[in-house]
Structures are given as structure tokens and as C-alpha cells.
């Protein structure tokens, strides 16, 4: 039999090296398993709609997300064109549907408003964004 002997007196390629080969194969298989990207929560639609012009001031802003969001870590704010916060400060996730985030508004005058949202999805991934809507002035 040909083969090189190692210090233990066993030939290379014997049972001693078998666990190393199996470990290597298992590591390659484990690393090749696809991993889910997670359930980041992104807006699906909103009311008022992104970029819309409203004839009547909305009573609130609602955003529907494509997945559930964490109530304790999700906020929604509305700002006027000078950067002043104008919402009622009652931002909340809908208790009956954790994909909806809403905030109340006072009667707003004509102008352009920026909606700013920040949410944590159930998988703990953070997303945030902004959009604008306008309220028509009297002609």
C-alpha cells in the first residue's frame, strides 16, 4: 500500500481526515442556503395620496404599509412649508390593523405639507420616508 504516514501512524486519507471533509461539505451547504431578506415595512398607499392636492383639508393622515409595524417604535408627523409641526401629536398604529399608521390633523389652511414617517417592522428593520400633499386655496 502506498501512502504517506502521518505522526499518528495512520495513512493520510484514513478515517482521521473523514470528519474534516464532512465538516467542509456541511459548511458549504449551510452557506449556500438562501436567507430571507426580512419583512421590511414599506408604504403601500396613503390618504391623502402622495403628491395630491386636496380641495378639503383632511382630518388625518393614514399610511398603509405592506407588513405589520411595531406600535411603540412607529411615528407619523406632518409639517407645514415653514417646517412647523402641525399634526395633533396623536400618531398611532391602528389597534385593529398593525399595517396602518395614522395621525390626526387640525383644520389646516391652504398650503403644502410634508408627511414624515418612521417605522420598525416586526422583524426589527427600520424604514422611514417623507412625502408631500397640498391643500387648495380659495380661487
Name what the model sees in each region.
Residues 54-56, 60-67, 124-139:
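Extended, polar beta-sheet/loop recognition surfaces of beta-rich domains
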Residues 104, 109-118:
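A glycine-anchored, Pro-Gly-centered beta-turn/N-cap motif
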Residues 61-62, 67-89:
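Short, surface-exposed alpha-helix to beta-strand junction/turn motifs within ectodomains of secreted
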Amino acid at each position: 500500500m502506498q501512502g504517506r504516514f502521518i505522526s499518528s501512524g495512520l495513512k493520510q486519507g484514513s478515517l482521521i481526515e473523514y470528519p474534516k471533509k464532512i465538516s467542509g461539505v456541511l459548511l458549504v451547504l449551510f452557506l449556500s442556503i438562501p436567507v430571507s431578506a426580512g419583512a421590511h415595512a414599506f408604504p403601500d398607499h396613503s390618504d391623502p395620496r402622495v403628491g395630491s392636492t386636496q380641495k378639503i383639508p383632511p382630518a388625518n393622515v393614514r399610511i398603509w404599509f405592506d407588513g405589520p409595524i411595531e406600535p411603540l417604535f412607529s411615528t407619523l408627523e406632518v409639517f407645514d412649508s415653514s417646517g412647523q409641526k402641525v399634526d395633533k401629536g396623536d400618531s398611532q398604529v391602528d389597534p385593529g390593523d398593525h399595517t396602518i399608521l395614522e395621525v390626526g390633523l387640525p383644520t389646516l389652511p391652504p398650503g403644502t405639507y410634508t408627511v414624515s414617517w418612521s417605522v420598525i417592522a416586526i422583524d426589527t428593520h427600520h424604514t422611514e420616508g417623507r412625502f408631500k400633499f397640498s391643500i387648495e386655496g380659495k380661487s
